[in-house]
């Protein structure tokens, strides 16, 4: 396993995402197969993976519970856990404290190693930045209290939206997670986003490197283009 230095940490270059966990009977809408997931986590750890990523809405809220149950079997200092505030749903904006406390409980931890503003984009940037909801203020207090070790954000929005968020909070963001792969390099303007984040000296976390597996298998024509 390759490791990347982040401040005083050494993070596995490959993380374990808990958005698409195996389900009972392979039913995409079924319950998470916790036994199989535990086997996957054990295998990943054996290969050196130490970064695990979950979120409030994954698997209808059960991803956090399952990952908490499984990771709780290991020493807390042996893994890094990332979770996210679900601002993709505007109904959550006035519930930041309630949701954060719930997430800690579901994951069975006292702190998150990494915590993100989930999916900053055009429809939620206003409430994310609205002092009425106080999301940044609350999360910053949790960081100061040690309940969030590193604060960052993920982004699916346009370049202009990313720039605006950075202009407001770039001095407080320690990392950013963006969709980065050979398709989105141009399709979602990832190249320009990378350059912007580099200007702010904000480390980049890669998500969707294969777009959920869709980029793993190509037609012969497109495979030839990539190799050309």
Per-segment meaning from a language model:
Residues 104-127:
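Active-site groove signature of glycoside hydrolases
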Residues 120-228:
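Beta/alpha (TIM)-barrel catalytic core signal, keyed to glycine-rich beta->alpha loops juxtaposed to Asp/Glu
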Residues 20-35, 84-94, 123-128, 221-223, ...:
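Active-site mouth loops of central-metabolism enzymes
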Residues 30-44, 91-108, 157-167:
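Short, acidic/polar
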Residues 6-10, 45-46, 68-78, 101-110, ...:
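Acidic (Asp/Glu)-rich catalytic clusters
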Residues 14-16, 44, 52, 67, ...:
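Conserved, mostly hydrophobic/aromatic
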Residues 77-89, 115-118, 178:
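A short, structured active-site edge motif that brings together acidic residues
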Residues 1-79, 138, 144:
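N-terminal binding-site loop/beta-alpha segment at the start of enzyme catalytic domains
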């Amino acid at each position: 396993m390759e490791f990347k230095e982040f401040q005083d940490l050494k993070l596995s270059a490959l993380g374990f995402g808990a958005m698409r966990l195996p389900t009972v009977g392979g039913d995409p809408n079924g319950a998470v197969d916790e036994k199989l997931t535990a086997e996957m986590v054990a295998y990943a750890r054996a290969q050196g993976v130490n970064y695990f990523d979950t979120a409030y809405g994954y698997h209808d809220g059960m991803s956090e519970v399952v990952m908490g149950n499984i990771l709780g079997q290991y020493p807390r200092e042996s893994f890094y856990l990332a979770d996210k505030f679900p601002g993709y749903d505007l109904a959550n904006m006035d519930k930041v404290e309630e949701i954060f406390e719930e997430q800690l409980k579901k994951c069975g931890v006292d702190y998150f190693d990494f915590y993100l503003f989930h999916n900053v984009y055009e429809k939620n940037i206003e409430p994310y930045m609205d002092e009425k909801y106080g999301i940044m203020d609350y999360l910053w207090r949790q960081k100061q209290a040690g309940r969030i070790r590193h604060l960052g954000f993920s982004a699916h929005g346009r370049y202009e939206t990313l720039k605006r968020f950075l202009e407001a909070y770039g001095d407080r963001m320690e990392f950013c997670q963006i969709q980065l792969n050979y398709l989105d390099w141009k399709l979602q303007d990832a190249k320009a986003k990378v350059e912007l984040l580099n200007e702010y000296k904000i480390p980049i976390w890669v998500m969707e490197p294969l777009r959920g597996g869709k980029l793993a298998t190509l037609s012969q024509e497109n495979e030839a283009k990539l190799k050309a």
